[in-house]
């Protein structure tokens, strides 16, 4: 008996963009395990599976202030454009910058005037008739560069980046923030990539090469090449710079005398 339902198939299709039959077969092959089903679809070459599986359904905005970054969600872009909603986001990120909370729950208890953040969100939610959610928060100390990006002129910022760094070249730090916003780096260095992610990418590269009919003796070299391609895409320091694609981000930072210690990227609608 299958360990999944028609609703599961529909959900996997929405997450990955793969066809209904492909999703059904992937769930059957993996005994209903969603993560393994996504991996199976990637091996079989379903288009854009990895990227679309990271997406979530949400509207809203990101806001930054003094080393704090928040994501505040709503249900429609109509509310995202609402001045009261945007004012609330500014108040929430100011509260985050002042209180430096460890997580979302702690931020909900921080103060906005005579109310808590949680109360302020609940009151506006009741007023405008949409569910509002404080989704996540990041707090960085030290020297920080923030960047917010709008998808269109009539919408509030949907992508936010914080970069914590050492060095005196603020322009270089700003360029890195733009890089992260545009190319969606997930890790700072190769050492930061979890072992299970590397193992999964290696397995996918190997099985994909086999499915393409590559000779067995050539697999190790092919797999290493594709794994290096993954690192160049996912690791910030190994990405080609958007300002000079003949050089890596690391090479340009070395010239500028800047060391990035950590970064975070929030995007509305992304997991």
UniProtKB/Swiss-Prot annotation:
PROSITE patterns recorded: EF_TS_1 (PS01126), EF_TS_2 (PS01127)
Keyword Cytoplasm included in the entry's annotation: yes
GO biological process, one term: translational elongation
Source organism, top-level taxon: Bacteria
UniProt-listed InterPro entries: EF-Ts_dimer_sf (IPR036402), Transl_elong_EFTs/EF1B (IPR001816), Transl_elong_EFTs/EF1B_dimer (IPR014039), Transl_elong_Ts_CS (IPR018101), UBA-like_sf (IPR009060)
Functional note: Associates with the EF-Tu.GDP complex and induces the exchange of GDP to GTP. It remains bound to the aminoacyl-tRNA.EF-Tu.GTP complex up to the GTP hydrolysis stage on the ribosome.
Region (Involved in Mg(2+) ion dislocation from EF-Tu): 76-79
GO terms for cellular component: cytosol; peptidoglycan-based cell wall; plasma membrane
Gene3D superfamilies, per the entry: 1.10.286.20, DNA helicase RuvA subunit, C-terminal domain, Elongation factor Ts, dimerisation domain
Record's keyword terms, sorted: Cytoplasm, Elongation factor, Protein biosynthesis
Further information: Was identified as a high-confidence drug target.
Protein name: Elongation factor Ts
A GO molecular-function annotation: translation elongation factor activity
Location relative to the cell: Cytoplasm
Family statement: Belongs to the EF-Ts family.
Pfam family of the protein (one): EF_TS
Underlying gene: tsf
